[in-house]
A protein has these predicted regions:
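A charged, aromatic-enriched C-terminal amphipathic alpha-helix characteristic of glycosyltransferases
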Residues: 277, 291-324
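A conserved mid-protein helix/loop that constitutes part of the nucleotide-sugar donor-binding site
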Residues: 19, 160-174, 193, 244
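N-proximal low-complexity "stem/linker" segments adjacent to membrane-targeting elements
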Residues: 325-376, 600-632, 765, 772
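Acidic donor-binding segment of Leloir-type glycosyltransferases
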Residues: 373-416, 642-670
């Protein structure tokens, strides 16, 4: 049973942050805890933080969170409110230090706007996981013909310095003196003098002035609808509950242009009356609002983003990300694991047949050492088949001496160059085992090599394992030497250095437990194993590789994209006769360049494609739904996607053929219909609605690392990204488990839900201006 996320909410019930936090806890069906010492220690907790609620000073507030984090044993996430900014004046340094300390305690941080995220990035040395979940907005109330607004300019919320009250009062000098100034709210504690100063200024100007004090929720909407000119002139706002409250009351408040306001306009087009960020701009807008009062009301079809339900979905998705996904048992006792969690595989005791495939070329002496080592394996000899795949040697390898100890077969192909990939495929085609264990002819396995290589695969059919290839000088060694070494009667050979890049790769990924899309680089075919079923499903190695190297990276990249689980087995040790290639030659740029050229067209790792070319196999396949688009808006959407260089776009839906015809011979990367097999591309992107991609938007989506990602672009559209990895693994086991592929993707890979503004996605227009 997974414990629900508890919300830690402290402070008076009428405080804006407290009200927001309690509403979100209710919407996500989360328990609320009102004091840190009441939190169950093993329960994930979400903290709604502002320094003003957790201590008398910013330092004291940070101390409270740090103390909680030191005692709490479960995941902590935090929503930060009132993010520090320069306008805090003398308090800025202390508040900055406070928020840094709180961020260090959290696994994930939430803020209410991209503007707030950028403010944090300005003060942070590191780049923590910061998410944006905007403050929710209730559906706007409909305008009633019975309401006749009073001739007043109104500001909502607590009164404190810097919120713009005095500037609004000054800007009203251009209005008739019978237009009053009303503050819907009360002074913040300790700032009653600000209210007194405003009242005195209004009296001096001969302008009506009133303040309501606290207004109960049941009366607030009516009060806001009674005001002629709704204003929010807080010029340092980073997230505003008061603006949202105006909108929910059906009003379209006057707000100064700025980074946060522009962001709100993307999420909720036309919900705000935006004016220039000057007192003069405000004065002009207020005068027009009195002349044209209809512009101060929300349209009847207004649907601001996010609604409370949408915000709750975003939070719920975030909380689910922190929950560990379990493995799923197959009917035959094996398992399918989430992500790359090979550590969740059960212990298997079966000993299925293993086919050891050895590519060979004129290496008789080295082969003799390898075959000798295979006779000493701890895996039952009756469950081992050995296949020597000769890559066109002048003379067939001699294996007669091992016929009594090993079930051994030789298969041959003509000498058409160095074709290790084709040789391995040839050997695999002769395999009768359930598991394929690839081993090079110059790489001598220790006695428990097969056991350590394949045991995980027995329990986990998606696994591709790679052993530990060590390096030694076996020149002059005999078969007898191998026997005395392995049974401990003699010392081992002179050892060469292991490649540091491999050691670091395995250490940094915890033996590939934390594998990502670039971990294919740590899978080497000299010591690689997988199930025969998976190998055949993948189509084996790419036989077009001719020359040394690259075929194992291509295979591992393809396997990972197809949902394979990569695992390094450090106790599966085999000894390569001689140093690593780089150690032996100091590196061979020409050879490595040839390998890179072969790989670039076959794998979609951006690091392999840095020359600005496009390839038939794209990294991203995008499918754009034409519903709701004009030909002009569609080309804007498609063109914005193709800013990502390694992408192809398919358009489908009403008018797709006609739209494509109107574009003429534009960009051969655009096609009509649905793409075919996308399994070798990194991900498929589905785009619905009037969505535009900023310059780096697609790259940012991919860099989340999510295997399934849904992004809301306000209420204008959605973007959904699914990796081929998640799709392929789910399809592989869907029928066996009797579970829909869609549901299995979520069970094995989760589902991230984010907002478009985080990535630079925004809404387009049905008829954008294309003319010049």
């Amino acid at each position: 049973v997974i414990a629900p996320v508890h919300h830690l909410v402290v402070g008076p019930p009428d405080h804006g942050v407290v009200r927001c936090a309690r509403d979100m806890a209710t919407a996500t069906a989360s328990p609320v805890v009102t004091a840190p010492d009441r939190l169950p220690p093993d329960t994930p907790v979400h903290i709604h933080f502002t320094d003003r609620l957790f201590g008398r000073t910013a330092h004291e507030a940070a101390d409270a969170i740090v103390a909680l984090a030191q005692q709490h044993r479960a995941r902590i996430t935090v929503t930060l409110h009132d993010v520090p900014q320069i306008s805090d004046g003398s308090a800025f340094a202390a508040r900055t230090d406070c928020y840094r300390r709180v961020i260090d305690c959290a696994a994930t941080v939430v803020v209410s706007s991209v503007h707030e995220r950028l403010l944090l990035e300005d003060i942070l040395d590191s780049r923590p996981d910061i998410r944006v979940i905007p403050l929710p907005i209730d559906r706007p109330a409909l305008r009633s013909d019975d309401v006749v607004p009073q001739r007043v300019v109104g500001i909502l919320g607590f009164v404190y310095p810097g919120k713009g009250h005095s500037e609004v009062l000054g800007a009203m000098s251009a209005l008739d003196t019978d237009v009053g100034f009303e503050i819907v709210g009360a002074a913040s504690a300790g700032h009653e003098d600000v209210l007194d100063e405003l009242r005195a200024t209004a009296r001096h100007l001969g302008r009506p002035f009133s303040t309501t004090g606290f207004v109960p929720d049941a009366e607030l909407g009516g009060r806001l609808r009674s005001i002629a000119v709704p204003v929010a002139f807080h010029r340092h706002v980073s997230a505003s509950g008061s603006i949202n409250t105006w909108i929910a009351a059906g009003r379209r408040p006057l707000v100064p242009r700025g980074r946060y306001v522009d962001e709100m306009a993307v999420n909720s087009p036309d919900a705000l009356w935006i004016h220039e960020d000057t007192v003069e701009g405000l004065a002009e807008a207020m005068a027009e609002a009195l002349r044209r009062p209809e512009k101060t009301w929300q349209a009847t079809d207004s649907a601001p983003y996010p609604s409370p339900a949408q915000a709750a979905d975003l939070y719920s998705s975030l909380f689910r990300e922190g929950m560990a996904l379990p493995s799923i048992a197959l009917p035959d006792g094996r398992s399918v694991v989430p992500h790359n969690r090979w550590d969740l595989a059960p212990t298997a005791s079966d000993t299925p047949r293993v086919s050891v495939v050895i590519p060979y070329f004129r290496q008789q002496h080295q082969l003799d050492l390898v075959l000798t080592a295979l006779t000493a394996q701890t895996w039952p000899a009756s469950r081992i088949q050995v296949i020597v795949a000769d890559d066109g040697s002048p003379e067939e390898p001699n294996v007669e001496e091992f016929g009594s100890a090993l079930d051994i077969t030789v298969v041959r192909q003509p000498d058409l160059g160095f074709r290790a990939a084709a040789a391995r495929n040839l050997g695999a085609s002769a395999a009768r085992g359930d598991i394929l264990c690839f081993l090079d002819a110059d790489t001598v396995p220790e006695p428990d090599y097969i056991e350590e290589s394949v045991r995980l695969i027995v329990a986990l059919p998606d696994a591709v394992t790679v052993g530990r290839r060590r390096h030694a000088d076996l020149g002059g060694w005999t078969r007898a030497d191998i026997g005395t070494w392995f049974d401990g009667r003699s010392a081992g050979p002179t050892e060469f250095t292991e490649p540091r890049w491999l050691r670091d790769g395995y250490a940094g990924s915890r033996d590939l437990l934390d594998a990502d899309r670039r971990s294919y680089r740590y899978v080497i075919s000299a010591v690689m194993s997988c199930s025969r079923t998976l190998f055949e499903e993948l189509g084996g190695f790419d036989p077009t590789f001719v020359g040394y190297g690259g075929e194992d990276w291509e295979f591992a990249h393809r396997a990972y994209a197809a949902g394979a689980v990569l695992a390094h087995r450090p106790r599966a040790v085999a000894w390569h006769d001689g140093p690593d290639w780089a150690e032996r030659t100091g590196g061979d740029r020409e050879r490595k360049n040839a390998e890179a050229l072969m790989l670039a067209s076959r794998i979609t790792d951006p690091a392999a494609r840095t020359q600005g070319l496009t390839y038939a196999l794209p990294e991203i396949v995008a499918v754009v739904d034409t519903t709701g688009h004009s030909a002009a808006s569609l080309i804007e959407t498609v063109g914005s996607i193709l800013r990502h260089p390694d992408c192809r776009v398919w358009i489908r839906g009403p008018g797709a053929d006609e739209s494509r015809r109107q574009w003429g011979d534009a960009d051969c990367r655009i096609q009509v219909g649905l793409p075919g097999d996308t399994a070798r591309s990194h991900a498929v992107l589905e785009v619905r609605g009037l969505v535009l991609f900023g310059a780096d938007a697609l790259r940012r989506l991919v860099e989340t690392g999510a295997d399934r990602l849904t992004v809301d672009v306000g209420n204008s559209g959605t973007v959904e990204l699914r990796t081929s990895r998640s799709n392929c693994r789910a399809r592989r086991w869907s029928s066996t488990m009797g579970t829909a592929s869609e549901d299995l993707v979520e069970a094995l890979f989760g589902h991230m839900h984010r907002t478009g503004a985080e990535f630079g996605l925004f809404a387009g227009e049905v008829q954008p201006k294309l003319a010049w």
